[in-house]
Amino acid sequence: MTQISERLLVQAHLDAKQPKPLTAEEEAFYRREIAAELKKQNAVLVAHYYCDPVIQALAEETGGCVSDSLEMARFGNQHPAQTVVVAGVKFMGETAKILNPEKRVLMPTLEATCSLDLGCPVDEFSAFCDQHPERTVVVYANTSAAVKARADWVVTSSCALEIVESLMDNGETIIWAPDKHLGNYIQRETGADMLLWDGACIVHEEFKSKQLLDMKALYPDAAILVHPESPQSVVELADAVGSTSQLIKAAQTLPNSTFIVATDRGIFYKMQQLCPDKTFIEAPTAGNGAACRSCAHCPWMAMNTLERVLTGLRQGSGEIHVDPALIPKAIKPLKRMLDFTQAARMKVAGNA
């Protein structure tokens, strides 16, 4: 695979596209205009926790959704709006379109991709799966529509453990793609027989245990929150490990007043909103300043700007199209995930 060289090329491409900061007046203008366009077009804005705070705030203000990728998929599927504007990365827009082929799905930019998606080309992955036909294919949501169509199950980080445990209980062996760190974490937690694809997130892979230990020494009373896309040595230092929504819940429920957070810093918007009396500190990345590749913020998530949201709504640009031949194949593993998580929710509610 050529993932490392691909990352460097993509980063160079992104460096030329960093958005310029807006004045307070410009920001207020865009927020008003976007809200009006959403209402006019019967559209709803859904945003991921890793988007910039202004995008998350706008989604909340306009009756949309700020959540992890599982809830984004569920919300877009259930909301009556005819247009869904997805502020996130491309696989999220594709997922919304697969689940809602009759709706118009827009994204602020179609260039917002994901290193996990890039690192799992469908031809290579299909060939890998064909070599192990006896295994159940489980793919992370951070993959293309074509890769999802090759899978038996799609999972997000908030439901991956439970789904893999269920498959393991049924005696199934697994192919896992694309994030090797998340796959390794699930394998350790469940003991499942898993073949792991060799992919990684450019944000989470930058967290390193030495720097995290150094920071913990500065804040000895802080709890460490870690996303399982991080390397094992980082995960092992965590007081809580989980998806974005699970880390937010941990911040609310743990008694600590200070947290060191090893995930994309976009999550701080929701953590600070829900826990205004607590302090959140970015976990250090492997590099400092200009030396780090992501500096704890996904460069593709940062491409979701107010200007691009408004332009997309007014011009209809950034519309997501998925090959109609892929949709029936890709919707099956997605529906399995949604049905599984819905059944789990109902079970929890019944036991409450």
From Swiss-Prot:
It is an enzyme of class 2 (transferase). GO terms for cellular component: cytosol. Catalyzes the condensation of iminoaspartate with dihydroxyacetone phosphate to form quinolinate. This is Quinolinate synthase. PANTHER family: QUINOLINATE SYNTHASE, CHLOROPLASTIC, QUINOLINATE SYNTHETASE A. It is found in: Cytoplasm. [4Fe-4S] cluster binds at C114, C201, C298. Its main location: cytoplasm. Pfam families: NadA. The lineage of its organism: Bacteria, Pseudomonadati, Pseudomonadota, Gammaproteobacteria, Pseudomonadales. GO terms for molecular function: 4 iron, 4 sulfur cluster binding; metal ion binding; quinolinate synthetase A activity. Its EC number is 2.5.1.72. Pathway: Cofactor biosynthesis; NAD(+) biosynthesis; quinolinate from iminoaspartate: step 1/1. Its cofactor is [4Fe-4S] cluster. Belongs to the quinolinate synthase family. Type 1 subfamily. NCBIfam families: nadA, PRK09375.1-1, PRK09375.1-2. The keyword Iron-sulfur applies. Binds 1 [4Fe-4S] cluster per subunit. Iminosuccinate binds at H48, S69, Y140, A141, N142, S157, H227, P228, E229, T244. Keywords: 4Fe-4S, Cytoplasm, Iron, Iron-sulfur, Metal-binding, Pyridine nucleotide biosynthesis, Transferase. GO terms for biological process: 'de novo' NAD biosynthetic process from L-aspartate.
